[in-house]
Amino acid sequence: MPKKIPFVTKSQIEQIVKEYPTPFHIYDEKGIRENARKLKQAFSWNKGFKEYFAVKATPNPHILKVLQEEGCGVDCSSLTELMMSDKCGFKNDDIMFSSNDTPANEFQYARKLNATINLDDITHIDFLKEVADIPEVISCRFNPGGVFSLGTDIMDNPGDAKYGMTREQIAEAFKKLKELGVKEFGIHSFLASNTVSNEYYPELAKILFKLAVELKEETGVHIGFINLSGGVGIPYTPDKEPNDIMVIGEGVRKAFEEVLVPAGMGDVAIYTELGRFMLAPYGHLVTKAIHEKHIYKEYIGVDACAVNLMRPAMYGAYHHITVLG
């Protein structure tokens, strides 16, 4: 198996642990910034492009500040994430609030911050109107149902997911929201998680671009942005090739030129809500080996545990280990 090279050396870690005892997480700020800039470059063809970092991926204010300096907004899905983003200085359309089964106080706080609200369900229109008010800019989440495939590979099953509105519901929602005074609409969808494929975003884009054209014709609304959400992933094992964000951006551009431009919708902004792609390659959990155990298998005990990295314990996720010593 090919080697994965950490962004820190043994000598650097030896110096760091003198001040910060293990276990701890360490991040490559230079790598994070370069990746954010490369993402912006990949979508530079779209005048309104913006990345809304998925705060749930790493709810760390220092990380949020770095990404804010690189021109990113934030994607929040809870009150805590909204509060953290507020404290970090994100305001207005720098915040995208996407949640489901949303409590009244979360909608109220999102409106207080003038965040862009992404409605998950058609019934939330009346609820939002009751507990707060209907803003002039709003987004609705779409679920196409069925199975989402790339070629012969099934990527995920949107029909089994609780998120989003059906095709009929989103059209009805747009009409109702237009009557309630909404002037600018957005469309959002999330169909697959951690895809290691350059085709996911372009295929999703085609679906949403065609939907946008249809909804504009049916409802007469102004669609200002289309949010591709997250789903662009990273390879966890060293033998897999990472996604090429430049190829992905070009694929979305081609779909944009093919579908939206002929429909007179070339001014639509493209948004993304990447989390894992933005940070996962640039963070390490540093832990120290402290015990050996020899029974039916050989074990090396470390000073980190599930509370430091929960994914392997919860569902057997693979995380590559590099021994620096």
Language model features with spans:
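Conserved radical SAM core fold
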Residues: 60, 81-83, 103-106, 144-161, ...
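Glycine-rich beta-strand-to-loop/alpha-helix junction loops that act as flexible
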Residues: 191-192, 226-233, 272-276
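Metal-dependent enolase-superfamily TIM-barrel catalytic cores that perform enediolate-based chemistry
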Residues: 124-127, 160-178, 200-212
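Non-cysteine beta-strand/loop elements that form the S-adenosyl-L-methionine
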Residues: 77-80, 98-101, 137-153, 184-189, ...
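Short glycine/threonine-rich loop-to-helix capping motif typified by GTGT followed
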Residues: 197-204, 235-248, 279-291
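Glycine-rich tight-turn/loop motif centered on a GG-T
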Residues: 21-23, 92-93, 111-116, 152-165, ...
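Charged (often Lys/Glu-rich) extended helix/loop segments that serve as interaction or gating elements
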Residues: 257-261, 265-325
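A charged N-terminal "starter" segment
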Residues: 1-117, 122-136, 177-179, 183, ...
